[in-house]
Amino acid sequence: MLSSVVIAASEEQHNPLIPEPADIVGSLICFVVILFFFWKLVLPRVKKLLDERAEAIEGNIAKADEAQHKAEALLEEYTAQLAEARADAAKIREQARTDGQKIVAEAKDTATAEAARVTASAQAQIEAERQTALVSLRGEVGSLAIDIASGVVGEVLTEDKKAQAIVDRFLADLEASEKATSNEKAGTAN
């Protein structure tokens, strides 16, 4: 059996792990041809395609940056316009408030002036009516006093100027004493 192993080893058989030299040369020629076609045809197309993609990506990035800058500029402009609109609205509100206060003040002044005018007119009318009533009352009091005096004396007294002057003086003294009394009451109340 040992002899058969030695015989088998002595016969040279081909090792499947080491290729034949003719196979190596043929494979090398095919590899070089494929490499040449790949180098001349496929690689430039792939490189061109990658360059186009890179340019497209860079262009999109540039467009995105430009759009972002435009958006930021528009945002700043919008913010400025919004701030300006708010300032204008504040001015308008303040102007309206000021105008409202002026209108209220004018209305108060007008109402106060009207009230003062009405009060003065009423006081003047009251004073005129008081004077009219006082003159009428003096005349009637004078007539009554003369009639009473005529009844006491038993003679008919005429309404002459002297009698009228006495009655007027008496009424004036009466008014003066009433004013003095009211002033004394006002002085003690304080």
UniProtKB/Swiss-Prot annotation:
<feature type="transmembrane region" description="Helical">
    <location>
        <begin position="24"/>
        <end position="44"/>
    </location>
</feature>
<keyword id="KW-0472">Membrane</keyword>
<dbReference type="GO" id="GO:0045259">
    <property type="term" value="C:proton-transporting ATP synthase complex"/>
</dbReference>
<dbReference type="InterPro" id="IPR005864">
    <property type="entry name" value="ATP_synth_F0_bsu_bac"/>
</dbReference>
<dbReference type="Pfam" id="PF00430">
    <property type="entry name" value="ATP-synt_B"/>
</dbReference>
<keyword id="KW-1133">Transmembrane helix</keyword>
<dbReference type="GO" id="GO:0005886">
    <property type="term" value="C:plasma membrane"/>
</dbReference>
<keyword id="KW-0812">Transmembrane</keyword>
<keyword id="KW-0406">Ion transport</keyword>
<keyword id="KW-0375">Hydrogen ion transport</keyword>
<dbReference type="GO" id="GO:0046933">
    <property type="term" value="F:proton-transporting ATP synthase activity, rotational mechanism"/>
</dbReference>
<keyword id="KW-0138">CF(0)</keyword>
<comment type="subunit">
    <text>F-type ATPases have 2 components, F(1) - the catalytic core - and F(0) - the membrane proton channel. F(1) has five subunits: alpha(3), beta(3), gamma(1), delta(1), epsilon(1). F(0) has three main subunits: a(1), b(2) and c(10-14). The alpha and beta chains form an alternating ring which encloses part of the gamma chain. F(1) is attached to F(0) by a central stalk formed by the gamma and epsilon chains, while a peripheral stalk is formed by the delta and b chains.</text>
</comment>
<dbReference type="InterPro" id="IPR050059">
    <property type="entry name" value="ATP_synthase_B_chain"/>
</dbReference>
<keyword id="KW-0813">Transport</keyword>
<protein>
    <recommendedName>
        <fullName>ATP synthase subunit b</fullName>
    </recommendedName>
</protein>
<comment type="function">
    <text>F(1)F(0) ATP synthase produces ATP from ADP in the presence of a proton or sodium gradient. F-type ATPases consist of two structural domains, F(1) containing the extramembraneous catalytic core and F(0) containing the membrane proton channel, linked together by a central stalk and a peripheral stalk. During catalysis, ATP synthesis in the catalytic domain of F(1) is coupled via a rotary mechanism of the central stalk subunits to proton translocation.</text>
</comment>
<dbReference type="GO" id="GO:0046961">
    <property type="term" value="F:proton-transporting ATPase activity, rotational mechanism"/>
</dbReference>
<keyword id="KW-0066">ATP synthesis</keyword>
<dbReference type="InterPro" id="IPR002146">
    <property type="entry name" value="ATP_synth_b/b'su_bac/chlpt"/>
</dbReference>
<comment type="similarity">
    <text>Belongs to the ATPase B chain family.</text>
</comment>
<dbReference type="InterPro" id="IPR028987">
    <property type="entry name" value="ATP_synth_B-like_membr_sf"/>
</dbReference>
<keyword id="KW-1003">Cell membrane</keyword>
<comment type="function">
    <text>Component of the F(0) channel, it forms part of the peripheral stalk, linking F(1) to F(0).</text>
</comment>
